[in-house]
């Protein structure tokens, strides 16, 4: 909850769709993409955009972008502008680099030597400053402050070995990966295909789904359904609402070509010798929707295991367990079950107080939490509460909640946090306050319970979080071939023979790559 209130947020979500079969298609591609972006709304609420194409040899790109939520940006009239399309990509954005302005809305479209490309990007380049200087030195102008535009221009820039008459997009993407090791998941649309790309460290998520007939959606045993199209998304949670089945993840370093005919791996780029995969562990903790799948496990299940581990590490004598609505609910339920305590709601959330609620005067500022939460005091008067939260960032939000509960009759309030203390900024696509703003780096952290007004405060350990995440991952036997990940076809797509790894830089200060300034 506190992550949401205090500006720790995912940068964006990407979504693409391509129709199978005969073109022009009967599939309503713009609506499919819009619904996909609605499913990714939690990943970005500042702006949204869609670019579609007819997929011809000289394609017509149609674009609509705007500030605000997906449903506000894409009205029926706006969607009509995107019709007669067979494929397209979309984007919903939060800003980590680049201002919150219309010019920074994605997808970006540029003209290249071989026609237009459209690019949607989730992540943040760790060496953006150096790449910006390099592009400017080569005479390539940049019209925005977004590092995503730099990716687009790097892709448009012809590699020295490429012949003028034959675009080699794999070479261009590999050149990008050489220039920028992390962090990005990309959708690149050119003519009649979409390229889905994940950086070699796999820091940002990306997965593929298969559009099937509506009549077959609920028949999970039917494996030979007609394929009406392919979709690719930051998270699998967006698939169900559009009638798609989860197919597989895009692997770290993988370049996938998605066409009207099939999905095929063009290449998999390895990391520097000895460097592990570094998937962002906070996708599990907070950013992803609980019904999404990463590494063959549901996010909700991981959060539940975190709650169980928290109960093992930090039990306390109490009467009930509750949560600050609502991202920590799985962890709170698990904590309660493990400790043999009842789970009871103590707060109800006012869902119509938005994230950007304006507090125009001191009285409203002082009311603070009371505007956002109602108190279910009959559930906890005279009782000892264990309140489970997903994080404590600055401490500005949880402290008023503790005060509110105690003033409403709670005998004790014990805080249990289902993730470790955040001590370091992220430079790979997550907007985290400066190191000095984080409560874990302040003198008050040594007596945090007293500072917050709680009876006790305990975080989940880093080891506990990592074990909770990795417990459910079905490791395959690792095989190597020239340092690349070996893949093979199976019934559900591709099978990866590599042990997973996770980035914990915001918790430990150990970044997967050397940072450049």
From Swiss-Prot:
Assigned EC number: 2.4.2.14
Pfam families per UniProt: GATase_6, Pribosyltran
Binding annotation for Mg(2+): 327, 389-390
Domain of life: Eukaryota
Residues of the active site: 12 (nucleophile)
GO CC terms of this entry: cytosol
Pathway named in the protein's UniProt entry: Purine metabolism; IMP biosynthesis via de novo pathway; N(1)-(5-phospho-D-ribosyl)glycinamide from 5-phospho-alpha-D-ribose 1-diphosphate: step 1/2
Tissues/organs with expression: Ubiquitously expressed.
GO molecular function, one term: amidophosphoribosyltransferase activity
Subunit structure, interactors included: Homotetramer.
Role, per record: Catalyzes the formation of phosphoribosylamine from phosphoribosylpyrophosphate (PRPP) and glutamine.
Protein name: Amidophosphoribosyltransferase
């Amino acid at each position: 909850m506190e992550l949401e209130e205090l500006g720790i947020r995912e940068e964006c979500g990407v979504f693409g769709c391509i129709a199978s079969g005969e073109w022009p298609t009967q599939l309503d591609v713009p609506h499919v993409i819009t619904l996909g972006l609605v499913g990714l709304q939690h990943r970005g609420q500042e702006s949204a955009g869609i670019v579609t194409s007819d997929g011809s040899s000289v394609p017509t790109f149609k674009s609509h972008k705007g500030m605000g939520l997906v449903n506000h940006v894409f009205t029926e009239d706006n969607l009509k502008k995107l019709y007669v399309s067979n494929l397209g990509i979309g984007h919903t954005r939060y800003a980590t680099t680049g201002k919150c302005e219309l010019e920074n809305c994605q997808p970006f479209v540029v003209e290249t030597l071989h026609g237009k490309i459209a690019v949607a990007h989730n992540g943040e380049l760790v060496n953006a400053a150096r790449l910006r200087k390099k592009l400017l030195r080569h005479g390539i102008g940049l019209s925005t402050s977004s590092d995503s535009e730099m990716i687009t221009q790097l892709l448009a820039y012809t590699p020295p070995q490429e012949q003028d008459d034959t675009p080699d997009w794999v070479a261009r993407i590999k050149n990008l990966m050489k220039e920028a090791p992390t962090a990005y998941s990309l959708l690149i649309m050119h003519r009649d295909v979409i390229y889905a790309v994940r950086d070699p460290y796999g820091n940002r998520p990306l997965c593929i789904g298969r559009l099937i007939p509506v009549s077959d959606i609920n028949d999970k045993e039917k494996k030979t359904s007609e394929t009406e199209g392919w979709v690719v998304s930051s998270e699998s949670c967006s698939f169900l609402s559009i009638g798609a089945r989860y197919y597989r993840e895009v692997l770290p370093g993988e370049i996938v070509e998605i066409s009207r005919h099939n999905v095929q791996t063009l290449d998999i780029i390895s990391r520097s010798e000895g460097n592990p995969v570094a998937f962002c562990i906070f996708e599990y903790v907070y950013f992803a929707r609980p019904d999404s799948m990463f590494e063959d496990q549901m996010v909700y299940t991981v959060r539940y295991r975190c709650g169980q581990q928290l109960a093992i590490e930090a039990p306390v004598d109490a009467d009930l367990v509750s949560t600050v609505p609502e991202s920590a609910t799985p962890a709170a339920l698990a904590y309660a079950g493990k400790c043999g305590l009842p789970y009871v709601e103590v707060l109800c959330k006012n869902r119509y107080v938005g994230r950007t609620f304006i507090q125009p005067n001191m009285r409203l500022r002082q009311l603070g939490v009371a505007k956002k939460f109602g108190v279910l005091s009959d559930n906890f008067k005279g009782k000892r509460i264990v309140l489970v939260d997903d994080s404590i960032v600055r401490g500005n939000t949880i402290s008023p909640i503790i005060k509110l509960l105690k003033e409403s009759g709670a005998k004790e309030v014990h805080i249990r946090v289902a993730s470790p203390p955040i001590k370091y900024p992220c430079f790979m696509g997550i907007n985290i306050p400066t190191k000095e703003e984080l409560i874990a780096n302040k003198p008050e952290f040594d007596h945090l319970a007293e500072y917050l007004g709680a009876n006790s405060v305990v975080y989940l350990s880093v080891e506990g979080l990592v074990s909770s995440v990795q417990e459910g991952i079905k490791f395959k036997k690792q095989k190597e071939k020239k340092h690349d990940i070996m893949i093979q076809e199976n019934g559900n797509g591709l099978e990866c023979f590599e042990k997973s790894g996770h980035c914990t830089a915001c918790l430990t200060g150990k970044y997967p790559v050397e940072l450049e300034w």
